[in-house]
Amino acid sequence: MAFKYALVADSLVWVGYNIFENTDEVLRAVKEAGYDGIDLPGSPSTMDGAEWKKRVADSGLVSPEVLGAWGYGHAGEVRNLASKEDDVRNYAVQYAKDCVDLAADAGASMVEVCAAQPAVPELPFPKDPIGLLRDRFRMSLKEICAHAKEKGINIVMEPLNSYEGFPGVLTTIYEAKMYIDDLGLDNLGIQPDVFHMNLEEGSIPDALRAVAPHIWHFHLNETNHYSHGMGHADYKAIFRILKGIHYDGFLANYCPLTTQEILAGATGDVYGTAGEERSGGDRSQRPDLVEALSTMVQFQKNIEKAVDLSRERYEADERRY
């Protein structure tokens, strides 16, 4: 079965665009480039879910997920699901519940959560005991999943690397599985991300095999954040594993980092910049959107074809002997 491909809307700023500006034009470009879906930003205070559901459907796409904005640099505020402070944790839980409501209204089936570092990262270990942070994060998951269950929404955990997420709380695929095993919730799954796995997992293929039934969404994000193929991600190995475990969810592509000037030219409220003036932007340097998006997804589809062909030949050889 062929993979389904989505675009992570938040990452459009890396190539100088913004989903909140000329939304319909951007959605049409995503469809024209060859994608099946688009992951929506986790901005429940500014988005009308019903309106976005119609816009996405009119463009011929679907929205698999609402991607939460958790890191301080992305959110512009503290959203800490593992905090020992009740008011801080409750605030983050409420944000997640609001994202669930947005997903339900927008026709998405999943919401992403993670255990992001605070504004000042705590390295190499958190200030508070890891066991305490895990307990608090576990409490948050229970509350969020209960609300999501009422709305028919699944929650997917995205393990972050230790520079962006609390070390020892949710930085590996295995830690994500620990929460699934502990809580036993049928609407809690995992969203692996190639960039983060590259930093944290001893073996990406082994990690994916270990949690195969729990992978419900997947982020394709090159190991250096640049164009797919310019890092050292072994996409063939990853795709072979996903084909082998019969993964039937979406592969969500991140746009690549380009230049500081192009990022600065992405207008609007992105990455915690609400109300801020950004200088140095040059929108004339932006790549053509359809071309940029189609280059990414075609790269992935070509690898998928190669993997499918090798699997077919291997199966044919097995039958021959």
Q: What does each model-identified segment do?
A:
Residues 1-15, 69-82, 115-125:
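N-terminal small/glycine-rich loop or linker at the start of catalytic domains
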Residues 11-13, 42-44, 69-72, 115-119, ...:
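Active-site-proximal loop/turn and secondary-structure-junction residues that shape catalytic pockets
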Residues 48, 121, 165, 228, ...:
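Glycine/Thr-rich phosphate-binding loops of Rossmann-like dinucleotide-binding domains
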Residues 1-16, 20-31, 170-192, 196-321:
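Histidine-acidic metal/acid-base catalytic patches
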Residues 39, 65, 112, 156, ...:
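Conserved beta-strand positions in the central sheet of alpha/beta enzyme cores
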Residues 2, 25-32, 46-71, 101-107, ...:
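Acidic (Asp/Glu)-rich catalytic clusters
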Residues 14, 40, 80, 125, ...:
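Conserved short-loop catalytic and cofactor-binding motifs
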Residues 58, 82-189, 283, 287-290, ...:
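Active-site acidic/histidine proton-transfer and metal-coordination neighborhood
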